[in-house]
Amino acid sequence: MEISVFSIQKSSRDNFENEIQEYIKMSAKFAKINDKIIFNEKIARAQSSGRSDALRAYDEIYEPNLKGFCVMLDENGSQLDSQEFAQILNSNSQINFFIGGAYGLSQNLKDKAQKVVSLSKMTMAHKVAKLVLFEQIFRGLCINANHPYHK
């Protein structure tokens, strides 16, 4: 199984990133996990230009990666409990999660996904959402392996 998380953000080495790397390391016994951070000058310029330019730039970056089972994170997506989330992981050998940039994700991109998921009804910083996603990936893998992490 291979799981990739794509995010549009500037690279940083902070405590959030350290925790994410820890979850990747712990998950490695169950699946290959990839953290794909994407940010370039084109995205920076597009975000400065406004919402429509930014969403178009996100589409250009993400569309070539729409392979396997694709899950978009969006505040209006389905809310799942950890067991339901684990079923997504259990049912697919290649899973790609996509976290939007400052302007979220375009409807076009969400329409191409197999699943659109919300981590919470609350708004949270992208780095917090990403950390929560990696924890839920680890938890889901543990549920599927009958590992005691999920109690």
Swiss-Prot record:
The keyword Nucleotide-binding does not apply. GO terms for cellular component: cytoplasm. Its EC number is 2.1.1.177. S-adenosyl-L-methionine binds at L73, G100, L119, S120, K121, M122, T123, M124. Keywords: Cytoplasm, Methyltransferase, rRNA processing, S-adenosyl-L-methionine, Transferase. It catalyses: pseudouridine(1915) in 23S rRNA + S-adenosyl-L-methionine = N(3)-methylpseudouridine(1915) in 23S rRNA + S-adenosyl-L-homocysteine + H(+). Belongs to the RNA methyltransferase RlmH family. Specifically methylates the pseudouridine at position 1915 (m3Psi1915) in 23S rRNA. This is Ribosomal RNA large subunit methyltransferase H. It comes from Campylobacter concisus (strain 13826). The gene is rlmH.
